[in-house]
Amino acid sequence: MMTYIVFILSIVFVMSFVGFATKPSPIYGGLVLIISGGIGCAIVLNFGGSFLGLMVFLIYLGGMLVVFGYTTAMATEQYPEVWVSNKAVLAAFITGLLSELLTACYILKDDEVEVVLKFNGMGDWVIYDTGDSGFFSEEAMGIAALYSYGTWLVVVTGWSLLIGVLVIMEVTRGN
């Protein structure tokens, strides 16, 4: 049952990308990205990553809501275009949805969904002793590994976000 839930969430995840690729107005693009981010968090939660799913949901979607609220206020239209207002956009949207649904039907024709990716490297991390408590959280160990082994990744990510914010502020500043 859980495999089918992840499969359905994955279908909706890809359909949201189709909706983003054929967005007629920036308002709908932001909305579809927020929906796809929430569905991605649900997929992570379904695989047991409760802390990671919650953090992505709070930080990523919270930041996106602020950014898209700001950009919507800056570039709002009185009558925004919708998917049915332009025939080419509607045709691209329907073609994308049909191709995704046909792919899903092809996968489900055998009456069984199987995991395509095998996670062979799951035991590669060194596990530290937890002491007398006996409690071990994989997510806490992953975050510890990110900050200990991936220090440069965290630094580069922080600088990239800072540069991105400065560029966006400069572009939207105007004359």
Swiss-Prot record:
Topological type in the membrane: Multi-pass membrane protein
Establish whether keyword Nuclease is in the entry. no
Entry GO MF terms: NADH dehydrogenase (ubiquinone) activity
Locate the transmembrane regions by residue number. 1-21, 25-45, 47-67, 88-108, 149-169
Read off the InterPro entries from this record.
ComplexI_Subunit6, NADH_UbQ/plastoQ_OxRdtase_su6, Nuo/plastoQ_OxRdtase_6_NuoJ
| Class of this enzyme | translocase
Question: Reaction catalysed by this chain?
Answer: a ubiquinone + NADH + 5 H(+)(in) = a ubiquinol + NAD(+) + 4 H(+)(out)
Q: What does this protein do?
A: Core subunit of the mitochondrial membrane respiratory chain NADH dehydrogenase (Complex I) which catalyzes electron transfer from NADH through the respiratory chain, using ubiquinone as an electron acceptor. Essential for the catalytic activity and assembly of complex I.
Self-association and partners = Core subunit of respiratory chain NADH dehydrogenase (Complex I) which is composed of 45 different subunits.
Designated name of the protein:
NADH-ubiquinone oxidoreductase chain 6
Organism annotation? Canis lupus familiaris (Dog)
What gene, per UniProt, encodes this protein?
Answer: MT-ND6
